[in-house]
Amino acid sequence: MDNRISAFFASVKGKTVAFCGIGGSNLPLIRMFADKGAIVTARDRRSAEALGETAVLLSNLGVKLVLGDAYLSDLTEDIIFRTPGMKYGLPELTAARAHGAVVTSEMEVFFDLCPCKIYAVTGSDGKTTTTSIIAELLRAAGKTVHLGGNIGHPLLPDIETIAPDDVAVVELSSFQLISMRKSPDVAVVTNLSPNHLDVHGSMEEYIDAKKNILAHQGAFSRTVLNADNAITRGFADSVRGERMFFSRLEPCAYGVFLRTDGWIVHAPSGTEILRAEEIKIPGLHNIENYLAAIAAVWGTVSPEIIRSVARTFGGVPHRAELVRVLDGVSYYNDSIGTSPTRTIRGTLSLYPEKIILIAGGYDKKIPFNPLGPAVVEHVKLLILMGATAPKIEAAVKAAAGYRDGNPAILHAASMEEAVSLAHQHAQTGDVVSLSPACASFDLYPNFEARGNHFKQLVQALS
């Protein structure tokens, strides 16, 4: 085992450690620190009754529970782990830092201790798919891959089993990046557009958080940037190591791009890697995801392996996922559509005919005006639900091409009603897609729960 890892766990023995939030991802961490001799407190807004067996399990581990609305009061522990979605600048955390506490996160500690090469992906859209493609490419090349961050499972509990020749592939959100003080060996930024402004407060803070992925890189690091996105292209001057671009729209002098004849090409070598039509998962956005992933692994994974993976990898659940075909109607789950740009670049770019779209959800305080014209062009029936329904309707009706009834707009009070309305109005040959253009937090704990509920309802149709 790496000496840094041994020294770290020796240092936490007897220390008081708090975990703020008892989600499924924190449970292995809590168990690990308790086993290493830390004095652990688990804090959560939920009651013991709501936590159920989890509360019993933690108590049996000797973990102190602080529950209820005041779960962040009296934060006096030596080390405090915040969950990725918890605001870094919360007054309670700021006060704890002022009193000498170390406020950190699972990913921060993992980056400090990880003995192997780290690939990390961030961006507004395409993070999970790009991260998954990188992991698939490296596995196919014979690497032992540890997948984590916002995808997979917590990696810190595995730290003692990770070998120097392994690779870690992680997806990082702006919430995770905002406080990180170490950068990956290979950093990928897929794109940037307004998102999470309910948490960050301004687009500038959101951009700065994302840019932190490359802030601490060295001369032998690699950064992969989207040349087609003005914001990510603007990161170029901050790159300290190797800089690679990817582009779907124009050639790159150094990077990976889609040539006008349909070939994905590496520059400056001119290597023809594969044709875009060979990629199994559909959509222009997935071509971009492959461009980014190929740039990340170039020099480690051969073109032959890249082609093999592209032809066989079926993608990630909740991303334009075909649920079933019923009476000639195709139902797709694109619950990952958590922002207008995701829905525009995903669902609204995939189908040749106008579709039935279920949209709406939690309000992240981001503008919907770009969504309006895309809905008018690609949607024949728009079914709206959730807190953002009025804003989306207003954006659609304000679009230049909108005419009354084109698209038709209906409102639903629940997912059950939305699916029922779609089923009632769909005809043979239609596509029905859930792609909300919003987060799920007003009705569901996460986009996976929302997508799974949609799939259950669609499977129950007859």
Predicted regions and their residues:
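Short internal beta-strands
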Residues: I39-R46, T223-A227, I356-A359, H378-A387
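C-terminal helical cap/extension that packs against the catalytic core
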Residues: A55-V56, L371-G429
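Nucleotide phosphate-binding/pyrophosphate-handling subdomain across enzymes
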Residues: R4-T16, N26-K36, T144, A276-K380
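N-terminal leader/targeting and accessory segments in enzymes
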Residues: M1-S105, V109, A394
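Beta-strand->loop->alpha-helix junctions that form or flank phosphate-binding loops
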Residues: T41-R45, V66-D69, T104-E108, R240-R259, ...
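Residue-level signal for inorganic ion chemistry
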Residues: F33, I80, V121, N150, ...
